[in-house]
Amino acid sequence: GEAMLPHSITRRRAAGRDGPEESAALDRLGWDAAPEECWTPEARIKGQARDGMMAEILYTSFCMIAMNIKDSDLAMACMRVFNDYAAEFIAYDKKRLIGVGACVTDDVPQAVEEIERIARLGMRGVMLPVTLAEGDSYADPKLDPVWAAITETGLVVSLHAGTSRAGINPKPADWPQLYAGVHYLIQRVLTDMIFTGVFDRFPGLRIVSVENDVSWLPHYAYRMDHFAE
């Protein structure tokens, strides 16, 4: 439900409509060229009917950027604002508009409070940053209250490519390496959580890996088994 495309993408795709004419219109008209379903739930449902879709899982683009804000309080404030917006959007039809909230975990009590609020708002999942702030790790038991809150509320954790509390400001020459190695970050998170017993302590915890590819899974599973043996 949120329209926020990087400038490089707007030149290639005009809010979901391919073609040079549409791209030129978006460059000329700005967001006035974007279809109404980008911000109106009523139009979004009509778009689903047009495209033969039963439902959509709605992710944030804004929070992927806001998670890079170093100031913890400001970053969390951005998460709250988005969660309020998303809750209002999905309220139109929660069966067909499935919301995923967003949260940062720098301050564990604040994170637990926001996770519980996300569940009360009717969301089905919560997006956490794949890369935490410097010095923090998903292997740290201090995050157990976060996993407990997520498990108790029935939310699903979404680990989306490109989400970081460590800051992302790569030089142009860095992009090929970052793009080719995007799966490494999610592997690191899963490895930390598996070998430190997070899933043993919270067997109901569910994780979704989003836009991190899947072809690496067989080899990753082999390497994990090899290490465990």
What do the PLM-derived regions correspond to, one by one?
Residues 1-229:
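Helix-coil boundary/capping segments in enzymes
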